[in-house]
A protein has these predicted regions:
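A well-structured
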Residues: 1-163
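Short, well-ordered alpha-helical packing segments
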Residues: 7, 11-14, 51, 114, ...
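Active-site recognition of the HExxH zinc-binding catalytic motif
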Residues: 10, 148, 253, 258-278, ...
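Short acidic (Asp/Glu) and glycine-rich catalytic loops that position anionic groups and cofactors
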Residues: 24-31, 88-90, 190-191, 243, ...
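Contiguous, non-catalytic segments that form substrate-binding/exosite surfaces or channel walls
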Residues: 106-258
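A glycine- and charged-residue-rich anion-binding loop/surface
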Residues: 217-218, 222, 273-276, 283-284
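Alpha-helix N-cap/helix-initiation motif
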Residues: 252-260, 283-290
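Post-HExxH zinc-binding segment in Zn-dependent metallohydrolases
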Residues: 287-303
Length: 303
């Protein structure tokens, strides 16, 4: 294998993986925003096919051989290429430990869970969602045992979201925060309460949407690449690359501040993602480096 050709194959592989991620992400986004209520099973069927193809591409012999070759020649790669290879090998090793049928079933489960959660929230019926939530917990615990049997499942997933983080580190950090935050909260609660009547009233959705658009422009978001939709619980997602960011909010007629802060928070996520270098689009280096950094950016703007 010629190194220059292998590097080109590396970029092609990542573009294909990004395309599958784009399609699967769009299914999730559609389900959480505008999809009709009765279409979850339809999306789940499509998700199962896409996730199976994604699994096969990720763990296939050609992919493994390519990355093993590049890893053996990593001294000849630049820093970005080395990181791409490292992250892809890490993903492959984890995915190889999870049976394909279980991986595909889990992707279908998430589509089902999102649909059930929306129905349960509308009626405040946790019992409706509880069985599906238990399945999600059970699956994640099982996957953690597959990938890192020597670790506590929670430590495994913590490290997946924030590389190297452990429960012990979190306990120590939160204990330090508690020492300072609890006295501060008590001090604040002892102060005269502010009159927040101005935040409550009747605020039409059209007016709140106009405020959302104003906030997004003021934050510097490129509205040609960042879209806004309504959903039950606000979130931000990248579709394919940082060139397509979708943020969502939830309007409450009697409390405009709820959506206002949601848009600022989610806008912070989108602003961070869109700051990625264009040369990294459609690679595993595109977007945020970790969940912790991502939340620090969204909270920075919201706070």
């Amino acid at each position: 294998m010629i190194l220059s050709e292998a590097i080109q194959s590396l970029m092609t592989l990542q573009a294909k993986l990004a395309a599958y991620g784009h399609a699967m992400g769009l299914l999730f986004y559609d389900g959480a925003t505008t999809a009709p209520k009765g279409t979850a099973a339809n999306r789940g069927q499509t998700m199962s096919i896409l996730s199976e193809e994604h699994y096969k591409l990720t763990t296939g012999s050609e992919t493994v051989a390519l990355l093993e070759f590049l890893d053996a020649h990593k001294a000849e790669l630049d820093e970005k290429q080395q990181r791409m290879v490292f992250l892809l090998i890490k993903d492959i090793r984890n995915m190889q430990k999870i049976p394909m049928d279980e991986y595909v079933a889990y992707q279908q489960l998430l589509v089902e869970a999102d649909d059930v959660w929306h129905r349960a929230k509308e009626t405040s019926d946790f019992a409706l969602f509880e069985p599906v939530l238990e399945k999600i917990f059970e699956t994640n615990i099982r996957f953690a045992h597959y990938c890192a049997p020597e670790k506590d499942p929670y430590d495994y997933w913590l490290s997946e979201y924030e590389d190297g983080l452990t429960m012990a580190q979190c306990d120590e950090f939160f204990a330090t925060l508690r020492e300072h935050i609890v006295p501060l909260l008590k001090k604040i609660k002892a102060q005269p309460q502010l009159d927040d009547a101005m935040l409550h009233g009747s605020f039409p959705e059209t007016a709140q949407d106009a405020l959302s658009q104003y906030l997004m422009r003021t934050m510097g978001l490129d509205l040609d690449h960042v879209g806004l939709a309504t959903t039950e619980h606000p979130f931000t997602t990248s579709l394919g690359s940082h060139f397509d960011e979708r943020i969502t909010t939830h309007y409450l007629e009697d409390n405009f501040a709820s959506s206002m802060f949601s848009v600022i928070h989610e806008g912070g996520h989108a602003l961070y993602d869109t700051g990625s270098a264009d040369e990294l689009a459609y690679t595993v280096l595109d977007g945020g480096v970790s969940m912790g950094i991502h939340e620090s950016q969204s909270r920075f703007y919201e706070n």
